[in-house]
Structures are given as C-alpha cells and as structure tokens.
Amino acid sequence: MSLVESDFEECLEFFSRPLPELLDGLLASLGEAGNLDSQGQRVEKAALVLELTGTECVREVVFKQEERGRLRGTEGPSRPPSSGAGDPRGATTLG
C-alpha cells in the first residue's frame, strides 16, 4: 500500500482540527477500551497518541512538500526525515 496525495491532505486536515474536537474523539475511543482509567489518565493517553502520530504524520508531509519544492526548483532547507517530538521541522537525531 503506497501513500497518495490525499493521504497527506487528510493528515493535515485531521491535525488542523481544534484540540477539543480531537480529544473528544480520542477520549471516546479510549473510554471504551479502558473503563478503569481515570479521566486524567485518558487525557494523558490521548495526548501521547496525538503527539506521536501527529509528529510523524506532519513530519512526513513537511518533508514531502520540501522535496517537491526541490524538484520544482524552489528549494527550501534540506532536512532528512527524522523522528522526534515537538516541531517536526526542527527534529534532529543525535548519535
């Protein structure tokens, strides 16, 4: 299964939604999976899921856009993809 342009658009659209809307959906899903968790634990799990998936998804979209710009001759800063939390454009790996 390969990624297509609509996958990137859906990723950006999903993570552009207001945070309360994202949390409501995730908390509803997590609420069904773990009835013993407190509200705080479910919020923490939701935040972790958003951070991990959002960082990776947006990082890939940004990298693809930069790659496309280089191919068109509107070259931006060249950064290889790397995992990390926070701003995906500033993610680096050490080692």
Swiss-Prot record:
Family according to the record: Belongs to the herpesviridae UL91 family.
Source organism superkingdom: Viruses
Organism: Equine herpesvirus 2 (strain 86/87) (EHV-2)
Gene: 30
Region (Disordered): 66-95
This protein's name: Uncharacterized gene 30 protein
One Pfam family per UniProt: DUF717
